[in-house]
């Protein structure tokens, strides 16, 4: 998220969305609030035209920046080309949400065992948490710089970005964000 908007633009956007800066990076929440504020600021609905223009320009700039970060991540991962694979199932739509793909099984796959997975003791675990943690470590080894939230969707990056401790409450909010995130952003899950 540090590569998306300048600090001043981020503050402006969050003010227009009526969200606290601590929510910066919670893309599903920001999207939902953007849709609400579009209705409120729309000139045809009696809203402020200048606020609407500024909101649209900042939000579209954020979306473009996040997309370019996701595209960069896909290029860095370059393990296979999507043109080499054909899939017509719903799960293959990279714009679908993680929660929509996993459905009722999401809770079972997000983390197998709290005490084991949270500390990374089981290196063969295939829960979403452990897969994203392994992906984080791989990126760090390859690029010699720690990935940050939005470049990496692991629980560690989430906690470090928002300065949260390890707790069931922060884990709950992280898994809600992952549930509402496009599968293309959480790329390692497709492998």
UniProtKB/Swiss-Prot annotation:
Residues 12-80 form the J domain. The modification N-acetylmethionine is found at residue 1. Keywords: Acetylation, Activator, Early protein, Host cytoplasm, Host nucleus, Host-virus interaction, Metal-binding, Oncogene, Phosphoprotein, Transcription, Transcription regulation, Zinc, Zinc-finger. Pfam families: Papo_T_antigen. Its main location: host cell. A zinc finger (C4-type) spans 117-130. It is found in: Host cytoplasm; Host nucleus. A zinc finger (H1C3-type) spans 136-157. GO terms for cellular component: host cell cytoplasm; host cell nucleus. GO terms for molecular function: zinc ion binding. The common region of ST and LT proteins comprises the J domain. This domain is essential for multiple viral activities, including virion assembly, viral DNA replication, transformation and transcriptional activation. This domain is also required for cyclin A-transactivating activity of ST. Promotes efficient viral genome replication by accelerating both G1 and S phase progression of the cell cycle. Inhibits host PP2A by binding to the A subunit, thereby displacing lower affinity regulatory B subunit. Inactivation of PP2A in turn results in the transactivation of cyclin A and cyclin D1 promoters. Late during the infection cycle, ST may induce dephosphorylation of host MTOR, leading to the inhibition of cap-dependent translation. May establish and maintain high levels of viral genomes during persistent infection in cell culture. Interacts with host PPP2R1A; the interaction inhibits PP2A activity. This is Small t antigen. It comes from KI polyomavirus (isolate Stockholm 60). The lineage of its organism: Viruses, Monodnaviria, Shotokuvirae, Cossaviricota, Papovaviricetes.
């Amino acid at each position: 998220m540090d590569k998306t908007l300048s600090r001043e633009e981020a503050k402006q956007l969050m003010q227009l969305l009526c969200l606290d800066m601590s929510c910066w990076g919670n893309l599903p929440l920001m999207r939902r609030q953007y849709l609400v504020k579009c209705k409120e600021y729309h000139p045809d609905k009696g809203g402020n035209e200048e606020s609407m223009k500024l909101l649209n320009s900042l939000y579209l700039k954020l979306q473009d920046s996040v997309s370019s970060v996701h595209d960069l991540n896909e290029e860095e991962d370059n393990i296979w080309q999507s043109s080499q694979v054909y899939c017509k199932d719903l799960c293959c739509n990279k714009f679908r949400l993680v929660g929509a793909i996993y459905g009722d099984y999401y809770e079972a796959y997000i983390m197998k065992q709290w005490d084991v997975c949270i500390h990374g003791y089981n290196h063969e675990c295939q829960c979403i948490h452990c897969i994203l943690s392994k992906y984080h470590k791989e990126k760090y080894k390859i690029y010699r710089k720690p990935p940050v939230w939005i470049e990496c969707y692991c629980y560690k990056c989430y906690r470090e970005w928002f300065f949260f401790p390890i707790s069931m409450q922060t884990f709950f909010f992280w898994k809600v964000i992952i549930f509402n995130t496009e599968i293309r952003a959480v790329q390692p899950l497709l492998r």
